């Protein structure tokens, strides 16, 4: 018999389907096992390629968000813009911040995928009484009407994605640098 790393250790204890769709519940070896694992190569080749970073909304979309976020090298790129929310990717250089800001009618969710930093939040720009260290896999929730800033304190770029509800930037937004983002706000 040939070595197959995906085959069960004992053929008597295979996972039996819950519903019978006309096939035998016991797989014949090796023909049926080949069919089960045929898609594994397709999945890995899909994940290895670089994604074209552009706005894919409002069409249905699936992405490896971790990989897309780490691939992004712009200050801000809209990845998906719909009617009710928006996903943007951000990359902050060493010592860079997103800038102290407030979204009066927009809730925001941010997730750190790489790097470390500090998030500051508060009811007024002069009183940011909420401060936390953030790092890989940290989630940040910013309620509407809250002043906030994220600062990269690490020695690598801080890579994160942000979800705005409702959308906060125009469809297709790409800001190469923070200066571009500030100019677009004016």
UniProtKB/Swiss-Prot annotation:
Listed Gene3D superfamilies: Jelly Rolls
InterPro entries (alphabetical): Cupin_2 (IPR013096), Flavonoid_dioxygenase-like (IPR052538), RmlC-like_jellyroll (IPR014710), RmlC_Cupin_sf (IPR011051)
Residues the entry annotates as binding ATP: 117-124
Record keywords, A-Z: ATP-binding, Nucleotide-binding
GO molecular function, one term: ATP binding
Chain segments annotated as transmembrane: none
Domain Cupin type-2 residues, every copy: 89-164
Name of the protein this chain belongs to: Uncharacterized protein YrkC
């Amino acid at each position: 018999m040939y070595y197959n790393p995906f085959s069960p250790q004992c053929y008597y204890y295979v996972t039996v389907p819950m519903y019978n769709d006309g096939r035998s519940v016991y797989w014949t070896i090796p023909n049926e096992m080949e069919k089960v694992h045929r898609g594994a190569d397709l999945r890995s080749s899909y994940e290895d390629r670089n994604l074209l970073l552009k706005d894919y909304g409002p069409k249905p979309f699936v992405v490896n968000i971790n990989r897309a976020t780490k691939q992004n090298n712009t200050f801000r790129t809209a990845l998906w813009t719909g009617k009710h929310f928006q996903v943007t990717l951000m990359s902050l250089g060493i010592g860079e911040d997103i800038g102290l800001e407030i979204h009066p009618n927009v809730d925001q969710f941010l997730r750190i995928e790489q790097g470390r930093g500090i998030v500051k939040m508060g009811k007024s720009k002069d009183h940011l009484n909420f401060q936390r260290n953030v790092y890989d896999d940290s989630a940040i929730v910013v309620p509407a009407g809250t002043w906030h800033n994220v600062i990269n304190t690490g020695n690598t770029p801080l890579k994160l994605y942000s979800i705005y509800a409702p959308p906060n930037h125009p469809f297709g937004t790409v800001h190469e640098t923070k200066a571009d983002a500030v100019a677009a706000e004016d």
